Regions:
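Core segments of cupin and vicinal oxygen chelate
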Residues: 17, 23-67
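Vicinal oxygen chelate
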Residues: 29, 83-129, 137
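Short, charged/polar surface micro-motifs in flexible loops or helix N-caps
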Residues: 64-67, 76-77, 89-93
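Conserved beta-strand in the GNAT
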Residues: 68-71, 121, 131
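Helix-adjacent hinge/juxtasegments
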Residues: 73, 77-81, 86
């Protein structure tokens, strides 16, 4: 258990080993792609699949292990949907049962910077959504 300054205690902890992706809510996905792939020179990911209706959103690659997902949302919503941290392999059910996190979705298989993997969505103390994901060794 990890004590925090407000006197509460967090349960079992996970070991974060990297940053996987950030999900940006954008008004116009094509305009956002033009900006991130144009002046910033980032590599497009799954754009053809998205345009063909086979992927729910496109991404841009920041590094071999990090992407930014571009999701169309109305401007009244937050600009950041969630961010994803890579953690060491773990037993998801043990993490859920330990009660240290407010789980909002998962575990489930989802797309990330290195392909599909198991992940879990949790809330931080301020209500921000954090995705925790681990990749199999071959990813």
């Amino acid at each position: 258990m990890v004590p925090v300054s407000d006197g509460s205690v967090w349960g079992e902890h996970v070991r974060v080993i990297g940053f996987d992706h950030l999900v940006l809510n954008v008004e116009d996905v094509e305009r956002a792609l033009g900006f991130y792939c144009g002046p910033l020179g980032l590599e497009p990911v799954r754009v053809d699949e998205w345009r063909a209706g086979k992927a729910p959103f496109p991404s841009v690659r920041v590094s071999p292990d990090t992407i930014i997902d571009l999701v169309q949302r109305d401007r009244g919503e937050s600009n950041v949907d969630h961010f994803c941290l890579v953690v060491e392999p773990l037993d998801w059910q043990q993490v859920v049962d330990a009660g240290g996190f407010t789980v909002v979705d998962g575990p489930g298989r989802r797309f990330g910077a290195r392909g599909h993997a198991e992940s879990l969505y949790v809330l931080d103390p301020d209500g921000n959504t954090v995705e925790l994901r681990w990749y199999p060794p071959e990813a």
